[in-house]
């Protein structure tokens, strides 16, 4: 590409200004001599080279985003896929490219979670902090500091007034989400606390740890009121069902256990995974009809509860908890499955994996409908907003990404 005489002169002046402002005096002298330039450079050239440089990078990013969107649209057009107007919100799925890629953490992201009410989300990291972001604008809001080691999991109560976090520092912290103050710290586990989840009534909290136990905590006092024992290895994740009567846990012992909260009885031990089970998710009621359909006419009357589990054996399994039977196994990821969520519309499952992708599964037909190249490194966590069309992911690449669904 050939520059005009005027463009060449402007470029020379911008380069001269850059050399002068960065103190490269001898280079500037030589450059001005070679380029036969006057000694004085007008003010309008101050910082011009940097401005041009950053605007080129910005434009390049926009071009790449538009190219990705165009490629996506062409693919959909060729496959005769419906557009957003024709597709109902219950069928919207995350589409590339990511709407935002948010940086700020200094270590891998361990967990991402939407706030149940406000348009914010939180991310937990091995850098011992929790960060709060606005997922609609991509703005960073604040950092919560208090843990002294990796933050492993976070959970909101149903109103979103309280946030609980747990850490490798062996503590659980309770944060007031209005003032962002740490209002309680709970001690009792003997090792890394890997998971935390509020009970639906908001009065109690459940935690799981590398010490092989699950504990129930009373928020008013901060005391441990129940301990569930039975897992033979590190308990990775614990999640409570919608009415708070059951809790599910998964472990390095390759099992998923379901417990009756009232009497601590282990109702089911699910043992078909062949490696560490990393993540679990209870089916919301919106999914029960779809799952019953998949199970066939003779079992249609059954209303669950149903549970998903994701494992280092690279599979996702769906379980009928009333019978302890594995309904299906979804195969497709090329590495550990680290996160799994139900689509609020009930038809899909979305998963995140160490193969750096997120996958959308049409479980009725037992097939992977879409694969998104999500991150530069392992994808460690995923969440789907209950009512807004957004998915968020976190990664070892230290970024949080926001994906729009359509």
From Swiss-Prot:
The cross-references to Pfam families, in alphabetical order and at most eight, read:
LisH_PAC1, WD40
Compartment(s) of residence: Cytoplasm, Cytoskeleton; Cytoplasm, Cytoskeleton, Microtubule organizing center, Centrosome
Provide a Gene Ontology MF annotation, just one: dynein complex binding
Q: Where is the composition biased (Basic and acidic residues)?
A: 74-89
- One GO cellular component term noted in the UniProt record for this chain: axon cytoplasm
User: Which key words are in the record?
Assistant: Cell cycle, Cell division, Coiled coil, Cytoplasm, Cytoskeleton, Microtubule, Mitosis, Repeat, Transport, WD repeat
Q: Which residues form the signal peptide?
A: none
WD repeat residues:
104-145, 146-185, 188-227, 230-269, 272-329, 332-371, 374-406
Q: What does this protein do?
A: Positively regulates the activity of the minus-end directed microtubule motor protein dynein. May enhance dynein-mediated microtubule sliding by targeting dynein to the microtubule plus end. Required for several dynein- and microtubule-dependent processes.
Return the protein name: Lissencephaly-1 homolog
State the species of origin: Branchiostoma floridae (Florida lancelet)
């Amino acid at each position: 590409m050939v520059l005009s005489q005027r463009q060449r002169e402007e470029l020379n002046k911008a380069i001269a200004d850059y050399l002068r402002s960065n103190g490269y005096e001898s280079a500037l002298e030589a450059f001005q001599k070679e380029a036969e330039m006057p000694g004085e450079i007008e003010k309008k050239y101050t910082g011009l080279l940097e401005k041009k440089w950053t605007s080129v990078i910005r434009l390049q990013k926009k071009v790449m985003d538009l190219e990705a969107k165009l490629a996506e649209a062409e693919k959909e057009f060729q496959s005769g896929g419906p557009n957003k107007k024709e597709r109902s919100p219950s069928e919207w799925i995350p589409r590339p490219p990511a709407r935002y890629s948010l940086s700020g953490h200094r270590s891998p992201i361990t967990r991402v979670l939407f706030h149940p009410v406000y348009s914010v989300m939180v991310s937990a990291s091995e850098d011992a902090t929790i960060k709060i972001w606005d997922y609609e604008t991509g703005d960073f809001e604040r950092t919560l500091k208090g843990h002294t080691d990796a933050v492993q999991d976070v959970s909101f109560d149903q109103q979103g007034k309280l946030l609980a976090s747990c850490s490798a520092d062996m503590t659980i912290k309770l944060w007031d989400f209005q003032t962002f103050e740490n209002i309680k710290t709970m001690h009792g586990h003997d090792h890394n606390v890997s998971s935390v989840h509020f009970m639906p009534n908001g009065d109690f909290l459940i935690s799981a740890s590398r010490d092989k136990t699950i504990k129930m905590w009373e928020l008013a006092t901060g005391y441990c009121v129940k301990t569930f024992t039975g897992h033979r290895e590190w308990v990775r994740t614990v999640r409570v069902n919608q009415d708070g009567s059951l809790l599910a846990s998964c472990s390095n012992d390759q099992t998923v256990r379901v417990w009756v909260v009232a009497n601590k009885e282990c109702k089911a031990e699910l043992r078909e995974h062949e490696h560490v089970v990393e993540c679990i998710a209870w089916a919301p009621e919106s999914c029960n009809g779809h799952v019953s359909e998949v199970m066939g006419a003779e079992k249609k009357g059954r209303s669950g509860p149903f549970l998903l589990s994701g494992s280092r054996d690279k599979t996702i399994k769906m379980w009928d908890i009333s019978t302890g039977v594995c309904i299906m196994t979804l195969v497709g990821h090329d590495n550990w499955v680290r996160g799994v969520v139900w689509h609020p519309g009930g038809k899909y499952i979305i998963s995140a994996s160490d193969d750096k992708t997120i996958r959308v599964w049409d479980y009725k037909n037992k097939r992977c409908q879409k694969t998104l190249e999500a991150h530069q490194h392992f994808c460690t966590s995923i969440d789907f907003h209950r009512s807004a069309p957004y998915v968020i992911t976190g990664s070892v690449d230290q970024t949080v990404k926001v994906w729009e669904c359509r």
